[in-house]
A protein has these predicted regions:
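Alpha-helical scaffold segments that mediate packing/assembly in large oligomeric complexes
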Residues: 1-75, 197-202
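Extracellular structured ligand-interaction cores
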Residues: 8-10, 85-87, 175
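Short secondary-structure junctions and interdomain/linker hinges
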Residues: 20, 24, 73, 77-84, ...
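Sequence/fold signature of self-assembling virion shell proteins
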Residues: 38-65, 101-202
């Protein structure tokens, strides 16, 4: 297999791994499931009786209530965290983001309807960035500083490997086989500096 084909295969493989981690593992992964680790959402949701600042009595999110529920999430975050130099970020999935956009349009904030991709980098109330994360469950939002959400791997371990096996020398075919093994995990720094809305709703 020539170098260009190998590079294309590796790009596709690593892209697929990253997409799967983002969609299925990083937020909602469960350590007991093969190929997964406890995601940020799983760790936060398990802290229901601990220090996480949960919004009381969450309900399903709609166009009519999304703005007030985002405000409730912000209100649940300790003022010391909101006052820090590094501002917390609001995390939600695509469906929740679309509800938020539609609510802004209905409220007459037409720039939400027209900017499209240029919305990236804009902040709610001029303070809080909204990050759209496909792995977060419906009716669920989190608020945290980026530095409080940790993703780690073990770069020096020999188990971290991506390989391509040219089958021509083994069976005469023009096929290739490829795979990857790696370590990864997610962790929360301070649960008391996390606000959450609606874990468990779907």
């Amino acid at each position: 297999v020539n170098a260009e084909i190998q590079a294309a295969i590796l790009e596709r493989l690593t892209g697929g791994i990253a997409a799967n981690l983002e969609l299925n593992v990083l937020w909602k992964g469960v350590n007991g499931t093969t190929g997964q680790f406890d995601g940020f959402g799983t760790i936060i949701d398990a802290n229901a009786n601990g220090n996480v600042n949960f919004v009381a009595t969450p309900v399903a999110l709609t166009v009519d209530n999304i703005i007030s529920k985002v405000d409730a999430l912000i209100a649940a975050m300790p003022i010391a965290v909101k006052s820090a130099t590094e501002k917390p970020i609001i995390y939600m999935n695509q469906l929740t983001w679309e509800l938020f956009m539609r609510a802004q349009i209905a409220a007459g904030n037409g720039w939400y309807a027209n900017l499209g991709p240029a919305m990236a980098g804009l902040k709610y109330m001029g303070l809080y960035e909204i990050a759209v994360c496909p792995g977060i469950a419906n009716n669920t939002m989190y608020m945290a500083r980026k530095s409080n959400l940790w993703f780690g791997t073990w770069l020096t371990n020999q188990m971290n490997e991506i390989f391509i096996l040219d089958m021509k020398e083994n069976d005469g075919s023009q096929n290739v086989r490829y795979g990857a093994t790696f370590y990864a995990g997610a962790q929360i720094g301070l649960t008391s500096e996390i606000a959450a809305y609606g874990p468990g709703l779907s």
